[in-house]
C-alpha cells in the first residue's frame, strides 16, 4: 500500500493535465544513480509486455530499487494506479559529439484512446547540461493527437523546453507528449532510461485530492502555452477540460464556458399554445 503522503497533489495533477508532464529534480539518490549507470552501460533485463510492473524488475537491481522509491511509487500510483503493467523500456543513448538530433515526435503509432492514457518515466542518471542534448519537450502538446513523427518537420516551437537537469532527475510524461532527443555536443555519452506503463484501473482520483477545491487548480488548468494559436489554442483548453473531467469524475467541470456551451443541446420541447 502506497503511503498517501507520497501521492501527487491536485495542483500537481492539474499541472500534468495542462502540461502533459511532471518533473522531479534529483529524485534518485547519488548511490542509486551510480549503480544505475553501471546497469545502463550493459543491459537492463525486462519482461514481456503486459507483465505487472511489480514483477518486472528485481528488487536487488538498481532500476528495481528506483521503481520502489516512495516518491516514484507515489507518482506511478497517482497517474496509472497501484498495479500498472509494464509496456516496454529502452536505454536511450546520445553519442558523444553526435551531429544528429531526433525529429520531434510522439511515441508509437497514433493513440486514439480518449481519455485514458499511459505514462512514460524518463530517468537521467547523470547531470545533463544544455550542450549534452537532453530531451526536448513541448508542453501542452499531449492532447493534440499525432502519428509518431508526422510533426518532425517542425522545429523551434515557442515555449519548448530543452531539458537541463541534475543527476537523478525523473520525468513523468503523458504518452502523447511531443518530444525529441537533441544533439549531444559534448565529449561524453548521454544516457536516459525510459519505461512505459499501462493502467489497469480507471484513472479517476488516484492521487491525494485534499486540495481539489483549491482555486489554484482551476487557474493551472486554464493556462495557455506560447505555441498555442489564439483560436486553436482554445481547443486545447476544451480538450484539457474533458481530460480533467475524466480524472476527477466531475462531468460539470469547465475552465470557462467553452465546453459547457458545446454540450448545450436541450431535449425539453416547448409547446406553443
Language model: regions and residue ranges:
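Short, solvent-exposed loop/turn segments at secondary-structure junctions
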Residues: 145, 179-181
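Non-heme Fe(II)/2-oxoglutarate
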Residues: 182-273
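Catalytic core of non-heme Fe(II) oxygenases with the double-stranded beta-helix
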Residues: 100-164, 202-211
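Non-heme Fe(II)-dependent double-stranded beta-helix
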Residues: 1-112
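Conserved metal-binding segment of the jelly-roll/cupin
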Residues: 165-179
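A conserved mid-domain beta-alpha-beta active-site/ligand-binding segment of alpha/beta enzyme cores
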Residues: 156-169, 220-223, 231-232
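A structural signal for short, well-ordered beta-strand segments
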Residues: 89-91, 121-123, 193-197
Amino acid at each position: 500500500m502506497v503511503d498517501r503522503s507520497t501521492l501527487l497533489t491536485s495542483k500537481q495533477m492539474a499541472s500534468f493535465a495542462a502540461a502533459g508532464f511532471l518533473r522531479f529534480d534529483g529524485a534518485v539518490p547519488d548511490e542509486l544513480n551510480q549503480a544505475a549507470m553501471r546497469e545502463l552501460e550493459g543491459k537492463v533485463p525486462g519482461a514481456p509486455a503486459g507483465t505487472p510492473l511489480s514483477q518486472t524488475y528485481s528488487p536487488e537491481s538498481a532500476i528495481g530499487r528506483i521503481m520502489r522509491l516512495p516518491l516514484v511509487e507515489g507518482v506511478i500510483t497517482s497517474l496509472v494506479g497501484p498495479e500498472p503493467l509494464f509496456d516496454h523500456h529502452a536505454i536511450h543513448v546520445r553519442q558523444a559529439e553526435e551531429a544528429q538530433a531526433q525529429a520531434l515526435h510522439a511515441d508509437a503509432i497514433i493513440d486514439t484512446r480518449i481519455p485514458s492514457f499511459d505514462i512514460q518515466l524518463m530517468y537521467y542518471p547523470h547531470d545533463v547540461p544544455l550542450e549534452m542534448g537532453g530531451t526536448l519537450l513541448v508542453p501542452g502538446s499531449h492532447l493534440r493527437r499525432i502519428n509518431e513523427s508526422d510533426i518532425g518537420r517542425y522545429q523551434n516551437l515557442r515555449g519548448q523546453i530543452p531539458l537541463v537537469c541534475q543527476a537523478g532527475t525523473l520525468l513523468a510524461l503523458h504518452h502523447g507528449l511531443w518530444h525529441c532527443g537533441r544533439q549531444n555536443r559534448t565529449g561524453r555519452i548521454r544516457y536516459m532510461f525510459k519505461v512505459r506503463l499501462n493502467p489497469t484501473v480507471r484513472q479517476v482520483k488516484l492521487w491525494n485530492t485534499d486540495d481539489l477545491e483549491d482555486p489554484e487548480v482551476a487557474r493551472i488548468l486554464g493556462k495557455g502555452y506560447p505555441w498555442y494559436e489564439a483560436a486553436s489554442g482554445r481547443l486545447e483548453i476544451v480538450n484539457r477540460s474533458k481530460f480533467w473531467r475524466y480524472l476527477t469524475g466531475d462531468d460539470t467541470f469547465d475552465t470557462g464556458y467553452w465546453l459547457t456551451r458545446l454540450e448545450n443541446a436541450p431535449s425539453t420541447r416547448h409547446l406553443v399554445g
